[in-house]
From Swiss-Prot:
Gene Ontology annotations for the cellular component aspect, listed alphabetically: extracellular region
Protein name: Potassium channel toxin alpha-KTx 10.4
Entry's localization field: Secreted
Domain of life: Eukaryota
GO molecular function (one): toxin activity
Residues carrying the site annotation Basic residue of the functional dyad: 21
Similarity field: Belongs to the short scorpion toxin superfamily. Potassium channel inhibitor family. Alpha-KTx 10 subfamily.
Domain remark from Swiss-Prot or TrEMBL: Has the structural arrangement of an alpha-helix connected to antiparallel beta-sheets by disulfide bonds (CS-alpha/beta).
Sorted UniProt keywords: Disulfide bond, Ion channel impairing toxin, Neurotoxin, Potassium channel impairing toxin, Secreted, Toxin, Voltage-gated potassium channel impairing toxin
Role noted for this protein: Blocks human voltage-gated potassium channel Kv1.2/KCNA2 (IC(50)=3.6 nM) and Kv1.3/KCNA3 (IC(50)=72 nM).
Range of residues in the leader sequence: none
Major site of localization recorded for this protein: secreted
Amino acid sequence: AVCVYRTCDKDCKRRGYRSGKCINNACKCYPYA
């Protein structure tokens, strides 16, 4: 699957995380910026 930054970030925020980033084409959620 291709990680799209905007989608990843929005998905992470909806799950209560601070932000999301694409690492090795995978979405990673972070509790901090």
